[in-house]
Amino acid sequence: PLEKDESINAILPVKEFSEEEFVFMVTSSGTCKKTSLSNFSRPRKGGIIAIELRDDDKLVGVEITAGKHDILLFSSAGKSIRFKESDVRSVGRTAIGVRGIRLATKDKVVSLIVAESTDPILTATEKGYGKRTQLDEYRTQARGGSGVISIKTSDRNGQVVGAIQVTDDDEMMLISNKGTLVRARAVDV
């Protein structure tokens, strides 16, 4: 049972609770946390804490990682940052974490990508605009910086709603808040 104001934000398939793998989490405020997957091997009936959140913060993305890839964070204002996963040290379950990206006042993180391949990144805005960018165009920088502009946000484009890593063969399904689905090939963006 969940608390009154609590909801499920992520589901992860786990075969083995290995010490060589990690749970990497990011919150809307840009906080990142990396915890050994083995720390989650003994859950309690009432659940266990995965990350300690501040009042106005929420969990945005969770991935299982090998600890050796690059991390990309994308914000609603079109900013992004790429840094080494090794820049975030592994901490216990109840820790808050560290700053992944420095955000402007009303900006928030909307996507987490663990770059396990060199495939391009597709960024989409709330008004249906998208941009496909080669991964190597996102330069690696120190964790906690302001990042770079990934896509321009404007009245025409709207805010960024998400970013995903795609291949030329991928097809995407974009679904509006009214339930309308648009299908597009990644290579056409």
Where does each model-flagged region fall?
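Short, structured "edge-of-domain" segments at secondary-structure transitions
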Residues: 1-189
